[in-house]
Amino acid sequence: MKFMMMHKNDPKTEAGEMPPMELVHEMGQFIGGYAQQGKLLDGAGLGASKTRTRLTFRNGEASVLHGPYAGQHELPASTLLLKVATRDEAMAWAKRYGTILGDGEIELGKVNEPWDIGIMPPPPNPPLQILLIDKADAATEATGRTAEKTAAIAALKDEMTQAGVLVRSLNLQPSAKGKRLLFTQNVLQVIDGPFSESKELIGGFAVMDVSGMDEILEICKRCAEILGGTLEVDVRLVE
């Protein structure tokens, strides 16, 4: 079974503080073990809200808000990893995507690269990787979007792939099939789905191919220990 586990931003990451190298290496070693087993399919960390852009679509119009800002409707329906030259290029694609959706919200978050966290020096003129987060709505949380919208999104994704912009995309099943994990000093509270939008921004994610919910919960528990024992994690099934 494929799951996406999403950890939420905390005050330190939102402030742009660099994680200690010991933490980076410990988490890398832990997650790297699953990569060697073929269980880690994807993953990325996102920058603080000051590196993000929120696009809200209402009545055919798009409003744009650049960070920093607080979280509000943080429940994804799908994610698209884009490789672009500039943020404006990503915004242009996001506006086309949002026009298909109608009323809705999209967030663009810069992906943290190894040089952003001090692992290696930056290469010359690196491309910009942006995670496009398509926020859930009543349709995606129920029966899904219309066949017309689904076909139009698929056609746009094909165009983005041909343009060398879309690296990969994932669709998530409704939150009714997921769980929200609230860790407080390594004490876990589990909230079964469906659940409402989180008010905490997504700080990063990993996509795992594991035996089931029990295994992904054990992975989340260990990640929480490494990250200090107090954080929020959403676990969602991947289509």
PLM features: residue spans?
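Conserved, structured core segments of small domains
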Residues: 1-239
